[in-house]
């Protein structure tokens, strides 16, 4: 445990917040894309589909690298049990709060919008369970994965810490090219696991809890560990914060490959396995692109940025039902996809910010949506 706090990484705080907030244009553009979603516009937009695909191809990989970085930083700062308790509370409490307050009403709304209320009684017990798993976890899946990664990383982080204490500090002798090869092989390994499951027991891939707990965790654990290694080895972080032409070009080529796979791939063939390899390496390269841009443009303290850093989780949690409401009841009345997209951003962000300000004034809601217990202020006693 370290008593000396690490210097504040303003650019990482900012990147994490903006990646979270990027979920808003991501889901609103999904309404106007060619992808089938809960609600869709009458006519899809090719450029909003392209925008949506680009965000989807890298956003969460970079997010989990930052999560791993901060998780290990705090692991060194606090006793093990306290670290685990705090980390799980910070993500677990908001997730459990959002299910009854946000995703359950969202599920009920969609049942009426999609006229499925009459079909619900005809579903089997497992079909009801699986539907609820997908719909109630919904956009909260990354919080569940963070709880799992935090628990799994106890042993990994402890091993990292012991190695730091017993070994002399030395540079991480690994280049971005070697990292690219490693992540390519990790993508192939993940694709192989998925293919084996598809051959042996394909039905399990449609199970919501299996998807969130097993498949999503397996895919994102390398990025989480990479974040911890970037904290342990400052020179590795420097590689990510230093612009790399190779990573930029590689990410561009990977995105083109991603689009081609989306266009010509087949779910019954190798589309999902190919996508996992592409997004694994593209995620790594985009860590360099995003970190280097963020380090240059966002590495400063600002009250406005701090506000959105603090508000980002709450805004992300509430934006999803607001987006679905907009798509179901407002989108059909706007003929232009561009105007609809912009109106959606204003509608969702505006209401989300109002709700954020309201929840700050209600201590119970503030605790439930942040997982942070209220700070006890010591009363000033007059001595004399």
From Swiss-Prot:
Domain of life: Bacteria
Parts of the chain that traverse the membrane: 17-37, 54-74, 91-111, 140-160, 173-193, 212-232, 240-260, 274-294, 311-331, 338-358
Primary localization class, coarse: membrane
GO annotations of cellular component type: plasma membrane
Recorded topology in the membrane: Multi-pass membrane protein
Places the protein is found: Cell membrane
Molecular-function GO terms, alphabetical: acyltransferase activity, transferring groups other than amino-acyl groups; transferase activity, transferring one-carbon groups
Keywords, in A-Z order: Acyltransferase, Cell membrane, Membrane, Transferase, Transmembrane, Transmembrane helix
Pathway assigned to this chain's UniProt record: Glycan metabolism; osmoregulated periplasmic glucan (OPG) biosynthesis
EC primary class: transferase
GO BP field: glucan biosynthetic process
InterPro entries in UniProt: Acyl_transf_3_dom, Glucan_succinyl_AcylTrfase, Glucans_biosynth_C
EC nos: 2.1.-.-
Family per similarity comment: Belongs to the acyltransferase 3 family. OpgC subfamily.
Described purpose of this protein according to its UniProt entry: Necessary for the succinyl substitution of periplasmic glucans. Could catalyze the transfer of succinyl residues from the cytoplasmic side of the membrane to the nascent glucan backbones on the periplasmic side of the membrane.
Protein name per its UniProtKB record: Glucans biosynthesis protein C
Organism from which the protein derives: Salmonella newport (strain SL254)
């Amino acid at each position: 445990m370290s008593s000396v706090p690490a210097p504040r990484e303003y650019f990482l705080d900012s990147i994490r917040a903006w990646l979270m907030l990027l979920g808003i244009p991501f889901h609103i553009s999904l309404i106007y894309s060619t992808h089938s979603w809960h609600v869709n516009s009458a006519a899809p937009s090719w450029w909003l589909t392209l925008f949506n695909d680009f965000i989807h191809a890298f956003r969460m990989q970079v997010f989990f690298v930052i999560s791993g970085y901060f998780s290990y930083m705090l692991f060194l700062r606090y006793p093990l049990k306290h670290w685990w308790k705090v980390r799980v509370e910070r993500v677990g409490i908001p997730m459990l709060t959002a299910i009854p307050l946000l995703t359950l009403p969202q599920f009920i709304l969609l049942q009426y919008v999609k006229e499925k209320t009459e079909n619900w009684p005809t579903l089997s017990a497992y079909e009801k369970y699986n539907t609820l798993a997908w719909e109630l976890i919904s956009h909260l899946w990354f919080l569940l994965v963070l709880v799992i990664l935090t628990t799994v990383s106890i042993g990994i982080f402890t091993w990292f810490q012991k190695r730091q204490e017993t070994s002399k500090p030395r540079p991480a002798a690994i280049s971005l090219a070697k990292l690219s090869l490693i992540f390519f092989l990790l993508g192939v390994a993940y694709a192989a696991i998925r293919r084996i499951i598809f051959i042996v027991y394909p039905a399990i891939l449609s199970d919501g809890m299996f998807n969130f707990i097993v498949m999503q965790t397996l895919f994102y654990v390398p990025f989480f560990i990479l974040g911890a290694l970037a904290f342990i080895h400052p020179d590795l972080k420097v590689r990510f914060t230093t612009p790399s032409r190779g990573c930029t070009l590689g990410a561009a080529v990977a995105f083109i490959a991603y689009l081609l796979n989306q266009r010509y791939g087949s779910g019954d063939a190798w589309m999902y396995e190919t996508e996992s390899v592409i997004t694994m390496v593209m995620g790594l390269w985009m860590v360099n692109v995003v970190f280097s841009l963020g380090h240059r443009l966002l590495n400063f303290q600002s009250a406005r940025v701090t506000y959105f850093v603090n508000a980002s989780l709450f805004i992300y949690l509430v934006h999803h039902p607001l987006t679905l409401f907009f798509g179901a009841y407002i989108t059909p009345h706007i003929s232009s996809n561009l105007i609809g997209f912009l109106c959606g951003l204003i509608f969702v962000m505006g209401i989300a910010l109002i709700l954020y300000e309201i929840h700050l004034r209600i201590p119970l809601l503030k605790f439930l949506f942040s997982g942070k217990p209220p700070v006890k202020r010591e009363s000033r006693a007059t001595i004399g």
